[in-house]
Amino acid sequence: MPSTSMIEDRGEIERRRFEYLDHPADIQLHSWGTTIERAFEACLVSMFGYMTDLEKVEEQYEFYWKVSGDSMDGLLFQFLDEALNSFHAEPCFVAKRVEIMRFDKEKLEIEFRGWGESFDTSKHETEADIKSPTYSNMQIIEKSDRCDVYVIVDI
């Protein structure tokens, strides 16, 4: 199966709830869901999917995180950055699936977990190295039946 970053089939893109948009120097992640929680989850999975083929990632163990922010954009940044730090440092965790267990919009806190495994160069291919999410052109668009999230990541 082609990597997530190469999928162009609209049906498959809709099923996954994310796509990659061209950007002059980096890449823009666009994710969506029926709620802000589902859109954030899809955004995080899309970030991992841009770095490696998630079809080759097994759900071997769970990893837990808790983050807070000073704004909704800051919360999204911390959400992505904390998970990315778990990929860049031991145990080099890559999540195939993510679930937000608690999303407090007033306190700007998220507790979440991911299912995946440690990145293994003998099993997983590196497709891109994401250094960090950015605030550049970050957008969270909430409507009554859908939330869209746009994040440019530094590669």
Swiss-Prot record:
SUPFAM superfamilies: MTH1598-like. Keywords: Calcium, Metal-binding, tRNA processing. GO terms for cellular component: tRNA-splicing ligase complex. Coiled coil: none annotated. GO terms for molecular function: metal ion binding. It holds the Pfam family Archease. GO terms for biological process: tRNA splicing, via endonucleolytic cleavage and ligation. Ca(2+) binds at D26, D154, I155. InterPro entries: Archease, Archease_dom, Archease_dom_sf. Component of the tRNA-splicing ligase complex required to facilitate the enzymatic turnover of catalytic subunit RtcB. Belongs to the archease family. PANTHER family: ARCHEASE, PROTEIN ARCHEASE. This is Protein archease-like. It comes from Caenorhabditis briggsae.
